[in-house]
């Protein structure tokens, strides 16, 4: 063959699976991020970048159990062949830290100043939707009952019809295979193949109106001078996730925001989450305001009612008996009453000492001592009921 007839192309014999390496690594990294989010959820929900994000779609949060990529050296100088014991997986750490297994003093921990380098952590971009899906998975409004079934209805889509034509995304694979099998069997060869046009079955939806129950949540927060920056941040973190949970899972839930010190007032949502107050503390004022709202706007015959009150427990001692009486009056009209107390140092609480005598099963309380308790308080107040759900 002459030079003029030589082919002007070459056949590549490289391993094409290597071209997917970057994609596979990216998928593995995303799986690690999701696993880290799940394992660190109690700490992540109170990250300031999330609570102060005003509900932005994507936020950057530190995930301390997820390391940044780096080369690690094996300090063991012994000669060896291969690595591991045969059961290693892609991504496993095989290097040793050279400490000989001895526990060393960590940087920035314990008493006294340290001279070691700080601990690096990975800052991942996470969508609020991802956190919500992991967080709200097992939450629901407790004791939810039907109210005004004939008046309050919502649109609902149901796949309740089968047709021979439709969108390919709505094809009913099971019914299509059964139809093909029956047709082929009638012709003497029972088989799922071939599938003809006449065998195709598509699911079709209809919009129906379904009865739904109304509910209102009364978010009550102590904004007095005894509520410091940390206490207010914890309370607002809880109410931030509570409002997102309610608006994500329920279409017909109203939320009223009430702030109080010695006096209580209904405030806009933005002011509730941003404005500071001062002064003394008379908690009975906020319960009176809640009862006033119920009497004027939210009849128990029409609404499921859920009051939630957050405070540091530092209340005027002479007001405690009045608070207990008003809480008991509220519980007669409400499905559940929730009290959250931010008490980081386990100090004596005048309000909690009075509330511990309330024996009603619809009264729930939770003491928050650290940031992770916001997650646990949500789980405690909105835990799924073991019995039957609302029909």
Swiss-Prot record:
Residues 1-31, 80-117 are annotated as: Disordered. InterPro entries: Spore_YhbH, UPF0229. Residues 21-31 have a biased composition (Basic and acidic residues). Residues 1-16 have a biased composition (Polar residues). Transmembrane segments: none annotated. Residues 98-115 have a biased composition (Gly residues). PANTHER family: UPF0229 PROTEIN YEAH. Belongs to the UPF0229 family. This is UPF0229 protein BCQ_0617. It comes from Bacillus cereus (strain Q1). The lineage of its organism: Bacteria, Bacillati, Bacillota, Bacilli, Bacillales.
